[in-house]
Amino acid sequence: MKKLLLPALLTFSATPALAAKGPFFSLANTDFIVLISFIAFIGVLVYFKIPGILSGMLDKRAEGIKAELEEAKALREEAQTLLASYERKQREVQAQADAIVATAKEDAEAAAAQAKVDLEASIARRLATAEDQLASAQAAAIKEVKDKAVTVAIAAAADVISSKLGKAELNALNADAIKEVKAKLH
């Protein structure tokens, strides 16, 4: 390909020179001089193997670009893998956060329900305690009224008995009462 390029290039460069006026192979013809200079320049380039050096440099540059493209492709794949990993982790963290929120909500609802049950139990206990205190106070009042009635009845009976019985009969009744109390206590 390189060998075909040089003759084709020379052929196309000589075409304008052939169209010039006057003898072509004269040193007065600038087209001929330019053609000779160009051929000499190309010859120098070929002699010093500049086309091979240039193609080698271009090949190295192409290989460098290819390596950079492969590296960029690998980096892109790695970045996509990392992105997918982070997105997956984000979804997992979001799912965990949602689960924590749901659990906290359930716990709060359960705590509220338990607090309501505890409050109702506390109210029931206080109500029962109040009812017990009321019943106790009522029983104490009834007992006090009965005791007072017994005391009044005893006092009235004592007055009636003392007014109707004599001193000897009262002493006999007191002695019998003391014996009865002793018998019941022992």
Curated annotation (Swiss-Prot):
Residue ranges of the TM segments: 5-25
Cellular component GO terms, alphabetical: plasma membrane; proton-transporting ATP synthase complex
Protein topology in the membrane: Single-pass membrane protein
Superkingdom to which the source organism belongs: Bacteria
Annotated CDD domains: ATP-synt_Fo_b
Localization (cell): Cell inner membrane
Any matching Pfam family: ATP-synt_B
GO MF annotations in UniProt: proton-transporting ATP synthase activity, rotational mechanism; proton-transporting ATPase activity, rotational mechanism
Key words of the record: ATP synthesis, Cell inner membrane, Cell membrane, CF(0), Hydrogen ion transport, Ion transport, Membrane, Transmembrane, Transmembrane helix, Transport
Record text on subunit structure and interactions: F-type ATPases have 2 components, F(1) - the catalytic core - and F(0) - the membrane proton channel. F(1) has five subunits: alpha(3), beta(3), gamma(1), delta(1), epsilon(1). F(0) has three main subunits: a(1), b(2) and c(10-14). The alpha and beta chains form an alternating ring which encloses part of the gamma chain. F(1) is attached to F(0) by a central stalk formed by the gamma and epsilon chains, while a peripheral stalk is formed by the delta and b chains.
NCBIfam families noted in UniProt: PRK13455.1
Protein purpose: F(1)F(0) ATP synthase produces ATP from ADP in the presence of a proton or sodium gradient. F-type ATPases consist of two structural domains, F(1) containing the extramembraneous catalytic core and F(0) containing the membrane proton channel, linked together by a central stalk and a peripheral stalk. During catalysis, ATP synthesis in the catalytic domain of F(1) is coupled via a rotary mechanism of the central stalk subunits to proton translocation.
Similarity section: Belongs to the ATPase B chain family.
Protein name: ATP synthase subunit b 3
Organism name: Dinoroseobacter shibae (strain DSM 16493 / NCIMB 14021 / DFL 12)
